[in-house]
Regions:
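N-terminal phosphate/diphosphate-binding loop that engages ATP/GTP or pyrophosphate donors
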Residues: 27-97
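Hydrophobic/aromatic beta-strand patches that form the interior of the parallel beta-sheet core
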Residues: 5, 35-37, 100-102, 155-157
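Walker A/P-loop phosphate-binding motif and the immediately C-terminal alpha-helix
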Residues: 3-41
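Active-site signature of alpha/beta-hydrolase-fold catalytic machinery across serine-
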Residues: 21, 25, 48, 148
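Short loop/turn elements that form and flank the Walker-type P-loop nucleotide-binding site
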Residues: 1, 30-31, 95-97, 128-131, ...
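Conserved catalytic-core segment of NTP-binding enzymes
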Residues: 115-170
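Fold-independent oxyanion-binding glycine-rich loops
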Residues: 10, 39-40, 104-106, 138-139
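Cytosolic-facing regulatory segments adjacent to core modules
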Residues: 81-95, 100-136
Length: 170
């Protein structure tokens, strides 16, 4: 069972940068492979880590939602949406030599991120036993932590600046 470390705090205080540095440190210390999870709708951990990504979980959600209504998003006949989504999940995992990256991303439409958050939770649970460390870059605030989206969370690094608002958010 991998150690789950999550970043939390106000937006713009360096959570993603610190997350990238922690992933680099773990990899250089031989604690690899690391599962990096970008659980922010405004995903950019891949840029910090210097990797190109495939489809995000949010994009897969869009494909499921539009299937049947938009010819561009078709699920093959004879397969359920749930089975198709399960099959496509591997496409959302970007693999490198030292770490793998799972990106939540955002959907194009309006609405709640509950389904995409559920996908993050499910994937982390499925993958957790394959990695000694899982490092999660969260969106601003504490919602991911307080809602229990991250299973078996061991450590939360609260990142802040010196402002009153930054400390209140952390």
């Amino acid at each position: 069972m991998g150690h789950v470390i999550a970043m939390a705090g106000k937006g713009g205080v360096g959570k993603t940068t610190l997350c990238g540095l922690l992933i680099q440190y773990l990899c250089e210390s031989g604690k690899k492979p690391v599962l990096a999870v970008d659980a922010d709708a405004n995903s950019n951990l891949n840029e910090v880590l210097g990797v190109e990504i495939g489809p995000t979980l949010g994009e897969l959600r869009e494909e499921i939602e539009r299937a049947g209504a938009d010819p561009k998003y078709q699920i093959p006949h004879g397969i359920t949406k749930a089975d198709w989504l399960e099959m496509r999940m591997s496409d959302a995992l970007t693999e490198t030599k030292d770490f793998d990256l799972l990106v939540m991303g955002r959907s194009q439409g309006q609405g709640c991120y509950c389904f995409v958050n559920g996908l993050v939770q499910t994937q982390v649970q499925k993958l957790q036993s394959q990695y000694p460390y899982i490092v999660v870059d969260n969106e601003a605030g504490m919602e991911h932590v307080s809602r229990g989206i991250l299973p078996n969370l061991e450590k939360v690094l609260l990142v802040s600046d010196c402002s009153r608002r930054g400390i209140q958010a952390a």
